[in-house]
Amino acid sequence: MEKKNCNPKETSSQKASDKNHLTLKNSLLKDIDFYLVTDSGLSKKGTLSDVKESVEAGCKIVQYREKCKSTGEMIDEAAEIKKICSGRAIFLINDRIDVALVVDADGVHIGQDDMPIETARKILGANKIIGLTVHNADEAIEAEKSGADYVGLGSIFDTFTKKDAGKGIGPASIREVRNAIKISVVAIGGINKENCRSVIENGADSLVAISAVVCSDDVKKETREFIDIIREIKGTGSSK
């Protein structure tokens, strides 16, 4: 029978290591301004082009969300996105933990009805980033307790990008969630340059604006403008 390791020093060392990883991830996620989520159905130039332009503009996190391609096609495209993001942006994959494992992505983003965070963490390990979609403070608190590194809160405003998003919960809900948890809050849903100020002013660490960016003829320009608005509100300077 295999003996259990009961060495208290080793246990303390592991706990310290896990805490350091958590602190590092929290720091990285708090520094993010604009969060790109891909959408091949809305994109004018294609997913790879969108990622390249957005990262070049200063985007520091990319979530690859693809619902229409085969697993093989997703793996190939994800591998290319990873190359673009390497050393410049955090690379996450929506839902598909299997694809994330194959390409060694930085983590995943999952929904309320997907695999439990605890299970995803066992599969991915302590060093990977796991984000969870939430709709209110109660879900956000539970996400933090379960080990999520950040929450994606929405839909903040009414949106046509995701048909099952429901009615917008309003920017005031961000403040409620921000006050309830310590991990990073990413706002998503119906956000554009006209309403994004209220999103950041209410406490979001970063935001997602899908159609406002990927439907554009100039993804780089749109990304940079979002980053500049966010940094102006946060007081952290320009992307230029």
From Swiss-Prot:
Listed binding positions for 2-[(2R,5Z)-2-carboxy-4-methylthiazol-5(2H)-ylidene]ethyl phosphate are T159, F160, T161, G190, I210, S211
Reactions listed under catalytic activity: 2-[(2R,5Z)-2-carboxy-4-methylthiazol-5(2H)-ylidene]ethyl phosphate + 4-amino-2-methyl-5-(diphosphooxymethyl)pyrimidine + 2 H(+) = thiamine phosphate + CO2 + diphosphate; 2-(2-carboxy-4-methylthiazol-5-yl)ethyl phosphate + 4-amino-2-methyl-5-(diphosphooxymethyl)pyrimidine + 2 H(+) = thiamine phosphate + CO2 + diphosphate; 4-methyl-5-(2-phosphooxyethyl)-thiazole + 4-amino-2-methyl-5-(diphosphooxymethyl)pyrimidine + H(+) = thiamine phosphate + diphosphate
Q: In which pathway does it act?
A: Cofactor biosynthesis; thiamine diphosphate biosynthesis; thiamine phosphate from 4-amino-2-methyl-5-diphosphomethylpyrimidine and 4-methyl-5-(2-phosphoethyl)-thiazole: step 1/1
What does the entry's cofactor note say about binding and number? Binds 1 Mg(2+) ion per subunit.
Its BP terms in the Gene Ontology are:
thiamine biosynthetic process; thiamine diphosphate biosynthetic process
Q: EC no.?
A: 2.5.1.3
Q: Specify the superkingdom.
A: Archaea
| Pfam families reported in the protein's UniProt record | TMP-TENI
Gene Ontology MF annotations: magnesium ion binding; thiamine-phosphate diphosphorylase activity
Keyword RNA-binding assigned to the entry: answer is no
Q: What does the record give as the function of this protein?
A: Condenses 4-methyl-5-(beta-hydroxyethyl)thiazole monophosphate (THZ-P) and 2-methyl-4-amino-5-hydroxymethyl pyrimidine pyrophosphate (HMP-PP) to form thiamine monophosphate (TMP).
For this chain, the family text in UniProt reads: Belongs to the thiamine-phosphate synthase family.
Name the chain's protein: Thiamine-phosphate synthase
What is the scientific name of the source organism? Answer: Methanosarcina mazei (strain ATCC BAA-159 / DSM 3647 / Goe1 / Go1 / JCM 11833 / OCM 88)
